[in-house]
């Protein structure tokens, strides 16, 4: 009966994936219970009184990072609906590329939407399906939606996990004692002491019923197309992706980057925290000194995934501070994991020069990002991307 507490711990481990809001829905065998808040998990779900409002042996949770729909309490997941076959709660990571088209069709046929999130489209399609059994309703829905997604759904009898046919967004399975856990990353399993079993496969539906894990694969087999940004930025460094820690991929990128040019500089400096593994790889390969020329304030959220450009711009100075005595009159190689809009990088370079750096050579660990991402990363237009407008 501590499902909600374990869910809160898992959400805490996944806080890096979204900071706009968080929510948990639990089921006690008879009733569903829901608590949603704007802000961080630790600000709301560490309180025992809040967790007491979420009884039951089943629960799902979600951290919001908006790609569709405004930042507001009504858009915080998991969503809940009472269907004629029983209750349904849904948490969704990703983005549906045909959500607006489906939404307009549903509205024309009498559906009433309470949110602006594409996740509600999934709920409405399941509710509208004329199939009798829940899994059939879900499959009916999945054949209508397009995009990159991982879903966790909870009904009166089942806990269900779904990954899109191309495996764009991640989903893993773990086990704790006799209970199964679905999560976006393995770090959420680690924090509760669960054993990592495997990743959910492309186009696979996994479900737990009567304490047994079962699987169906309704889609034709597709070539795997995982989001490269999971490897580069999103996933926590200690999370496993394809059997390796994200940290290893990032460090290897830094090592390969160092092989491209032989720069003369005093120090290799990472943009913390996401640039640290690549900078370590770069320093190791180039045999240069690694220094923390920037110190991060860990009480400020991740700049890239803040919802507006104005907040992103302010967030850089709130988040990072140069170590002046280290970098003064020094030549630096500044390593970051990626360059999207260029907002953060421009301000960091300016900050380093103002702190006394003699030279700043910027090196980016991942290839140029020239095209929008419509599958769950907030890069909706080409004009926003620095590399696309050089």
Residue ranges, per PLM feature:
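Conserved short alpha-helical segments that host acidic/polar catalytic motifs at enzyme active sites
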Residues: 1-201, 207-265, 271, 359
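Flexible loop/turn segments at secondary-structure boundaries
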Residues: 2, 67-68, 98, 168-169, ...
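A generic structural motif
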Residues: 22-25, 292-297, 360-366
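Secondary-structure transition/capping motifs at alpha-helix termini
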Residues: 111, 131-132, 260-266, 284-291, ...
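Amphipathic alpha-helical
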Residues: 121-133, 272, 284-302
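PRPP-dependent phosphoribosyltransferase catalytic core
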Residues: 142, 157-158, 193-199, 218-220, ...
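Extended, hydrophobic alpha-helical segments in both membrane/secreted and soluble proteins
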Residues: 268, 275-282, 286, 290, ...
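Short, glycine/charge-rich flexible loops or terminal/linker lids adjacent to PRPP-binding catalytic cores
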Residues: 287-333, 343, 370-380
């Amino acid at each position: 009966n501590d499902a909600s507490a374990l869910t809160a711990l898992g959400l805490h481990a996944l806080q890096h994936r979204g900071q706009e809001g968080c929510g948990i829905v639990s089921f006690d065998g008879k009733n569903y219970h829901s608590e949603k808040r704007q802000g961080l998990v630790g600000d709301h779900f560490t309180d025992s009184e809040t967790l007491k409002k979420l009884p039951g042996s089943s629960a799902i949770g979600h951290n919001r990072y908006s790609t569709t729909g405004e930042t507001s309490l009504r858009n915080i997941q998991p969503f809940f609906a009472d269907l004629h076959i029983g209750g349904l709660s849904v948490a969704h990571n990703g983005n549906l590329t045909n959500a607006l088209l489906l939404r307009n069709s549903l509205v024309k046929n009498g559906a009433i939407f309470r949110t602006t999130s594409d996740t509600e489209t999934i709920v409405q399609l399941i509710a509208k399906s004329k199939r009798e059994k829940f899994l059939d309703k879900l499959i009916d829905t999945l054949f209508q939606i397009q995009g990159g997604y991982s879903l966790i759904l909870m009904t009166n009898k089942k806990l269900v996990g779904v990954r899109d046919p191309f495996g764009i967004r991640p989903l893993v399975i773990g086990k704790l004692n006799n209970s199964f856990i679905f999560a976006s990353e393995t770090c959420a399993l680690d924090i509760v002491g669960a054993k990592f079993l495997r990743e959910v496969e492309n186009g696979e539906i996994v479900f737990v019923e009567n304490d047994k894990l079962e699987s169906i694969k309704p889609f034709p087999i597709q070539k795997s197309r995982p989001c490269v940004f999971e490897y580069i930025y999103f996933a926590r460094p200690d999370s496993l992706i394809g059997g390796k820690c994200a940290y290893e991929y990032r460090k290897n990128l830094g090592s390969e980057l160092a092989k491209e040019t032989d720069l003369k500089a005093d120090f290799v400096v990472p943009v913390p925290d996401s640039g640290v593994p690549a900078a370590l790889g770069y320093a190791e390969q180039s045999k240069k000194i690694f220094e923390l020329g920037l110190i991060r304030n860990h009480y400020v959220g991740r700049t890239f995934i803040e919802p507006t450009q104005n907040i992103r711009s302010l967030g850089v100075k709130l988040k990072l501070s140069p170590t002046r005595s280290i970098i003064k009159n020094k030549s630096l190689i500044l390593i970051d994991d990626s360059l999207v809009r260029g907002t953060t990088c421009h301000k960091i370079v300016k900050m380093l020069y103002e702190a006394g750096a003699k030279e700043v050579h910027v090196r980016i660990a991942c290839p140029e990002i020239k095209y929008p991402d419509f599958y769950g990363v907030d890069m909706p237009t080409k004009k926003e991307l620095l590399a696309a407008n050089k």
